[in-house]
Amino acid sequence: MDYENDPGWKYLRRSREEMLQDQSRAYDSKKNVWIPDSEDGYIEGVITKTAGDNVTVSIGQGAEKTVKKDVVQEMNPPKFEKTEDMSNLTFLNDASVLYNLKARYAAMLIYTYSGLFCVVINPYKRLPIYTDSVARMFMGKRRTEMPPHLFAVSDEAYRNMLQNHENQSMLITGESGAGKTENTKKVISYFAAVGAAQQETFGAKKAATEEDKNKKKVTLEDQIVQTNPVLEAFGNAKTVRNNNSSRFGKFIRIHFSKQGRVASCDIEHYLLEKSRVIRQAPGERCYHIFYQVFSDYLPNLKKDLLLNKPVKDYWFIAQAELIIDGINDKEEHQLTDEAFDILKFTPTEKMECYRLVAAMMHMGNMKFKQRPREEQAEPDGTDDAERAAKCFGIDSEEFLKALTRPRVKVGNEWVNKGQNIEQVNWAVGAMAKGLYSRIFNWLVKKCNQTLDQKGISRDHFIGVLDIAGFEIFDFNSFEQLWINFVNEKLQQFFNHHMFVLEQEEYAREGIQWTFIDFGLDLQACIELIEKPLGIIAMLDEECIVPKATDLTLAQKLIDQHLGKHPNFEKPKPPKGKQAEAHFAMRHYAGTVRYNCLNWLEKNKDPLNDTVVTVMKASKEHALIVEVWQDYTTQEEAAAAAAKGTAGAKKKGKSGSFMTVSMLYRESLNKLMTMLHSTHPHFIRCIIPNEKKASGVIDAGLVLNQLTCNGVLEGIRICRKGFPNRTLHPDFVQRYALLAADESIIGKTDAKKGSALMLARLVKEKKLEEENFRVGLTKVFFKAGIVAHLEDLRDQSLAQLITGLQAQIRWYYQTIERKRRVEKITALKIIQRNIRSWAELRTWVWFKLYGKVKPLVNSGKIEAQYEKLQETVATLKDTVVQEEEKKRQLQEGAERLNKETADLLAQLEASKGSTREVEERMTAMNEQKVALEGKLADASKKLEVEEARAVEINKQKKLVEAECADLKKNCQDVDLSLRKVEAEKNAKEHQIRALQDEMRQQDENISKLNKERKNQEEQNKKLTEDLQAAEEQNLAANKLKAKLMQSLEDSEQTMEREKRNRADMDKNKRKAEGELKIAQETLEELNKSKSDAENALRRKETELHTLGMKLEDEQAAVAKLQKGIQQDEARVKDLHDQLADEKDARQRADRSRADQQAEYDELTEQLEDQARATAAQIELGKKKDAELTKLRRDLEESGLKFGEQLTVLKKKGSDAIQELSDQIEQLQKQKGRIEKEKGHMQREFDESSAALDQEAKLRADQERIAKGYEVRLLELRLKADEQSRQLQDFVSSKGRLNSENSDLARQVEELEAKIQAANRLKLQFSNELDHAKRQAEEESRERQNLSNLSKNLARELEQLKESIEDEVAGKNEASRQLSKASVELDQWRTKFETEGLIGADEFDEVKKRQNQKTSEIQDALDACNAKIVALENARSRLTAEADANRLEAEHHAQAVSSLEKKQKAFDKVIDEWKKKVDDLYLELDGAQRDARQLSGEAHKLRGQHDTLADQVEGLRRENKSLSDETRDLTESLSEGGRATHALSKNLRRLEMEKEELQRGLDEAEAALESEESKALRCQIEVSQIRAEIEKRIAEKEEEFENHRKVHQQTIDSIQATLDSETKAKSELFRVKKKLEADINELEIALDHANKANEDAQKNIRRYLDQIRELQQTVDEEQKRREEFREHLLAAERKLAVAKQEQEELIVKLEALERARRVVESSVKEHQEHNNELNSQNVALAAAKSQLDNEIALLNSDIAEAHTELSASEDRGRRAASDAAKLAEDLRHEQEQSQQLERFKKQLESAVKDLQERADAAEAAVMKGGAKAIQKAEQRLKAFQSDLETESRRAGEASKTLARADRKVREFEFQVAEDKKNYDKLQELVEKLTAKLKLQKKQLEEAEEQANSHLSKYRTVQLSLETAEERADSAEQCLVRIRSRTRANAEQK
């Protein structure tokens, strides 16, 4: 049977891998220790320092603790990790025992041996270790063969009983809740199963009669098991610790016959807790039977028992808990009632028992009251008393009278004594307790009667003792004294038994030892309790002393024993919840404080004799009379005395004076006497914690129980002896390293070798002689010596391994050198072959050989195909023939089966006389044999034919598969040929098309070049014109900037101008007379208008010409774009086919020099391609490799061509882009011209309107001219101030540029550092990959060594078993030899003393004895030789195993060190990754800031250019205006000669002044804002620069520190890796296995390199951007110098602009307002944009958080789904198993029914035969004796058949029962799986709902983000609108400048 496949095996013994893992931890016997801890009992520590009596211990996580040496306890080597027997521990101490139990309990290994003890810890859950399969494992096995288990101890007891013919006992002790009752039940079930198995064996040997089978419907084993429900119902209750606690002790004796069959059973009980009937503590409950009665299992039971109240109203049982979680009282009552039936309780007995239970509940509700002024109690209501009396079957009045006024004897008379209420209540409680105790006694007696089977001899028994363990509570009373006294007795029994066995072994081994009886250690405490004048004697004495109290008892005890007895002490003051104590007693488990309250009453246990008399007189209740039958009241004793019967008198006296202590002591003495007559086995139950939590150990609680259970006491005894022992061969084999020379002797003589080895160790002062003893077969060691030997062995082994490693390294380096030389030679050969192939590949004959060879092979393939087709046809014919033969054989078999069936039918139908039946049966049997022979032959032939048919079918399938493969290959070849031809045609077509396109492209390129030259000339001209226009605009802008200073004065002038205009309106009528002059002026204006129109026509003509050219160019561009798109489509197709050829693309990129060279090279390549294509047609039938090569060449060529096309496309696109730029410039010029045209048209209209008002302005011209002169001076002053501010701005801008350059340089340095960090990171990752590969290789090697070690260990175990068998044979031979010697000595003494034998006879006897002795000696020598050989083999294998194990350990250590280093590498790399990521983030931030600053700088530069242009324009305008002002001044000085011209100019100047004023306002505001922005930018740049410098300094320092640290780490790692590489060179043998992993890692490395390259590209791009910014800054500096020059020129021209100022003011105001509106809207949009950005950032963070949560939820759902699928799989498996079992069950039922029918048929046949036998007997004279004899034989045969079938039916029924049980188990498992599935389904639904909710939230967040994005886009649109408005304002300013230029040209 494969034990390890059993589901319960993992809870019994660890696997080999787990053992090796546990035993591989580091250990130092001198440093690893245990130290006390308040929570965990003991914790592990390492001694770091010793100072006097104190030691400093490191306890993990850097913590240290200083303790005294006395409290430190040694730690055992890893060899003893989770050991199954704690007595083998080399350091036997409390800490090691606790740790071993804790470690095993954590692995759910709940059973552990401790010498003779079996310690079991309550697991608080169901474990599959009590099943039938587990029980069968342990049957018949030795204790050492199997893991610790209750069944192992039970089976050992059973085997000892059968083999030694000695009674056995199993002592199960422990605290309440530790699992005593459950273990007792398991023991009883195991013995019942073993007995039943023995019963089946016995029944198979000797058939039972039908009468016996009918009688025995319920087996004895079932009845034994069914005693548990009855005893648990009446003796178990809920306590705080245990829901089913046994409140009594029991000793169950199971009697067996000599054959091992269960014969009978009887039960004895002890110390029943009677007080629980009337009193329960909080959290506890009364006995189960009281609550089962209320469960309504029997519907009318409560009515019959008069229980008409709820259970909570019955005082005796309702003082605490009423229900128990997890226990159904109804189901329990059903089990109890069924057990009553199985145990043969009659319905009347059951009912009477229930009635007595109900009567006690009614008694608890009886109430009494005190009569006024009397010491007399009376009933307070009689309903409950009447119900109780009815249940008792007595009169209620007599019952109440007996309670309130009992009869007592006063002198010689009997009188009724009055009782007070306290006495009555005490009497009621005492009666209830006494009655329940007697009911329990009756139940046990009844069970014993049922289990007392007759007819089977009771030769031996196994007793199971289930009794409470030692108890130390806060309040210890009379009950605790007796429980502790019993445990003292049991511990003394154990100590005596344990060391008797121990010292018997010492005597057998012949070592020196002084006998010690450790049982005497407890004798003092036992004598204190039970001896005369002891506690029990004084308690009994006080019970008969008048007026004695509990205090007088306590005082007498103190006076008698305090200070006189060592175990009697004065109690210490109470602590915490402890109660007051009267005295203390020192037990083996500790000192217990006892309180004497109520001891006298509990000991006397008085009963009301009058009530007992009333109950004994019951006529309706037989049970109550029976339970009180043995009780003799005082009246009965007096009556018996009066009659003069001495026996009665003696009986009455003993009944009156028997105390509880006397009864307990009597039963205890019987128990101990019985145990002393048995061979004991000890089981100690442990409760792990008070919380009933599985897997949790409360160290203090467990240590206390180990003390109370005697486990630690047993360890104390072991320490005084030699607890560790090793066989001589094992010792020699394991420690041969310590004394190699002496160990050689040990191979032949193990004992001598062991002695010599130990002597050498003593001589070397490594051991002391008193620490060990050498026995006959074993070496005995004191505690701790084995650990010392292990340390010595490890040291020697380490030295040997070091030398071995050096040799191995040298050997592998030699192999590596040889391998490298071979590799170099192979590389040279490969290079030579490749060179030869490169020369041959262009040789024509070699190409021809390549073409011809496939054709030769194709011909062979066709021939092979034809042969295969012929073979297939042959095989098909053979298959058809074989199928026909098979069909014929099947028909013959069917025919034979049919004939057999017919013969059987005829056989059944034949019913004649006995002789005819016999003859027919004989004939039928012969025919049957013949037919069976034929059938067998036919079956064999059929099997042969079927095998042949199967083989033929296999061959047929193989041939068909080969044919199919050949067909497929042919088809593939044809398809490949067709595909190659099609590809060739397509390639040729593509090549021709591409050549045509190339020619077209060349033509187009030449045309484009010509057009480009022409366009460049035109662009040059346009560029010159644009430069001139820009210069003019620049001058105007500069003038505008200077005029902005005069805005404030201009505003005042505007107000005055408005007033003047009002005056002018009044004087309009006066100007009508001057209309003629205006008409003349109009004619002049018409003339100028016609001139302007002619100029406009010329401009329009030029524009039309340019438009035509532009359209032509656009058409050409569209044509080119269309061609390029077509080229792109074709190139895309080529790219799809040639995407994998990167190397060719790089070569093509490097191969082009210029366009003509590219064309020539392309032509050559096309020619090569054509030749390659022709060769491709010829080589179409070659191998796939050649076809692949051809495709590769084609793809390379096509790729080069595609890349050339890409270059052409790029050049064409560049040309198109240039043309597009030119077209855009022309379109812009056209737009400007159209705008100027519209402007001129508007000016003309305005001039026409201004003529009407010129007359009004003449009078004011002089006054305005004078005002202009004043304002001009003011404007000059403001212009000077503006120039100074502009110079300041230029200087600040220069500083900003220099700072920007510094920042760029710093960014470059930072990027260089990041590149260095990336290189270092790549280096670390490479080293990490190398270390990982080495670690994986070592782990595989370690696995191989581990497997080898396992195999050797298994062989070693087999050899050990063989040696043990041989040793046993040797011992047997030795015993026979010694026996013969003894007999020889006896004969010799007899001869010498008595002379009964003569000399001849004596010589003959002597010869026989000598002959026997020589034979035995020869056998012994043979056994010794065999043992020596086996030991040698075992030693050799053990040495090999140890060597392999050491090598595996070394590799494991190396692997662990590499793993640690790998983890360190991982940590270092993670830190570097984190730092690099931080640097990337900082770099991104710096680059972002740099981009922002560069953008702002660019914006400032643009604004600066705009301002410069405005200033320059304003300067020009100012100059022109100054000239005009000077001319006007001259004309005014001349008089009114030019009034008309001045009025016209004044009107124009006023309009221009308004426009200039608006432009000036706008320019001034823009300049102010730019100045503020410049200042802010300067401050921000300085702050950013300081922060960046600070960060760079910190990072540089941090980089330097890390560089130093990592350099040191790299150096140390490099040194370590060098040494490790030398040591691990042997692991390169598994390199092939790791190639797949290496490929994957290389792919990952490629991805990482690609990512690194992308990062480097990004860095280079950023560097390019920074360089561009630097270039931009340089250009800005150049422009600044130009601006300074323009500014100086503008200052010279500023005086000219005075006259134009007033007109510019109005326009500048409007522009300023528009600008402010735009700026405010822009600011609002920017703020809104910032808010949206922040919201987007928050939403992005929330989204990422939600994504993380969703990922977590998805992982949870995935785990839940996996667990769900696993549960479903388990459910399906369980369902399939259940279905299979159901099918088996149905099959067994059908078989059982069939057997039943056959049985009935046989019975009818027997009846018929019986009738025939009767008829034959009647006709005996006629038929003769011979017929009768034959009939009787026939009858016996039928009877034997009937018995056989009956046995089969019985076995089938048992099989059916087992199948039913399995079905129920599987149904339970399916239900559990279904529950788990439902739970998982609920979890999945919850997670799904949560996921949906989070998805909804994510969608809402995305919607919100989209809305914000739409808002952002809206703001951006409004911002663009504002920019357009600003552009329109600039255009307005351009118009002003153009007007100014026009006026200047006119003048």
From Swiss-Prot:
The keyword Coiled coil applies. PANTHER family: MYOSIN HEAVY CHAIN, NON-MUSCLE (PTHR45615), MYOSIN-2 (PTHR45615:SF20). Pfam families: Myosin_head, Myosin_N, Myosin_tail_1. Residues 1053-1075, 1125-1155, 1231-1245, 1516-1529 have a biased composition (Basic and acidic residues). InterPro entries: Kinesin_motor_dom_sf (IPR036961), Myosin_head_motor_dom-like (IPR001609), Myosin_N (IPR004009), Myosin_S1_N (IPR008989), Myosin_tail (IPR002928), P-loop_NTPase (IPR027417), XRCC4-like_C (IPR014751). There are four different myosin heavy chains in C.elegans. Found exclusively in the pharyngeal muscle. Keywords: Actin-binding, ATP-binding, Coiled coil, Cytoplasm, Methylation, Motor protein, Muscle protein, Myosin, Nucleotide-binding, Thick filament. Residues 856-1947 are annotated as: Rodlike tail (S2 and LMM domains). GO terms for cellular component: cytoplasm; muscle myosin complex; myosin filament; myosin II complex; sarcomere. This is Myosin-2. Muscle contraction. The rodlike tail sequence is highly repetitive, showing cycles of a 28-residue repeat pattern composed of 4 heptapeptides, characteristic for alpha-helical coiled coils. It is found in: Cytoplasm, Myofibril. The keyword Coiled coil applies. Residues 28-77 form the Myosin N-terminal SH3-like domain. Residues 668-690, 773-787 are annotated as: Actin-binding. The lineage of its organism: Eukaryota, Metazoa, Ecdysozoa, Nematoda, Chromadorea. GO terms for molecular function: actin filament binding; ATP binding; microfilament motor activity. It comes from the Eukaryota. One of its GO terms (biological process) is muscle contraction. Its main location: cytoplasm.
